[in-house]
């Protein structure tokens, strides 16, 4: 797995005090460890931006809920990647079905984000990312114990996906 870039702390000055703001990756890691699934953790790391677009935190959590475990624990596309795409679509997606150029541009963005994730982690498929870990497709999620968190890379994958999207959004601010 790539080096952890999400531990960087961003400092902002406001009047005479310095406020440390966590990266989106740090937020996603914490959210996953609070019990949100991988897709929800990445999505909710961008809750403020989504709320500014009229998507409440609760709605965002609900929209992302199906993508955990590689789409309902089917172990297909990693939920972190799905969350990243979901947020990108909400913030930068196209809405006109006839806008072919906008659709193409958006698909290109998503492919670039997914390629970056794959380059940093070796895959974007859940069962491949969890190689060597029980990846059954039973719909019953495992209990979130300390052992669960130690054996799975999911918290770090959520951090990685959120950091990739955060960099993308900063680079593409309009």
Regions found by a protein language model. Name each.
Residues 2-34:
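Polybasic, low-complexity association/targeting segments
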Residues 10-21, 43-66, 135-139:
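Acidic-glycine-rich active-site phosphate/pyrophosphate-binding loop
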Residues 24-52:
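Active-site-proximal helix-loop elements at catalytic-domain edges
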Residues 26-33, 67-75, 146-151:
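A short glycine/serine-rich beta->alpha loop
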Residues 34-38, 55, 76, 153, ...:
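Short, contiguous, pocket-lining structural segments
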Residues 39, 44-49, 87-88, 98-174:
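Amphipathic alpha-helical interface segments
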Residues 75-85:
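FAD-binding core of FAD-dependent oxidoreductases
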Residues 83-93:
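DPxDG-like acidic metal-binding loop motif
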């Amino acid at each position: 797995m790539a080096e952890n870039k999400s531990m960087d702390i961003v400092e902002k000055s406001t009047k005479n005090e310095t406020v440390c703001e966590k990266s989106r990756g740090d937020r996603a890691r914490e959210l996953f460890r609070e019990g949100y699934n991988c897709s929800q953790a990445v999505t909710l790391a961008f809750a403020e931006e989504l709320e500014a677009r009229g998507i409440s935190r609760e709605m965002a959590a609900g929209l992302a809920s199906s993508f955990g475990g590689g789409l309902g624990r089917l172990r297909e596309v990693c939920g972190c990647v799905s969350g990243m795409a979901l947020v990108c679509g909400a913030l930068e997606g196209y809405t006109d079905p006839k806008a072919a150029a906008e659709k193409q541009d958006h698909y290109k963005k998503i492919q670039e984000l997914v390629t970056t994730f794959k380059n940093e982690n070796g895959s974007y498929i859940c069962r491949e990312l969890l190689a060597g870990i029980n990846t059954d497709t039973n719909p019953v999620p495992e209990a979130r114990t300390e052992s669960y968190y130690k054996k799975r890379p999911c918290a770090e994958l959520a951090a990685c996906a959120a950091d990739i999207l955060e960099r993308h959004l900063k680079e593409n601010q309009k």
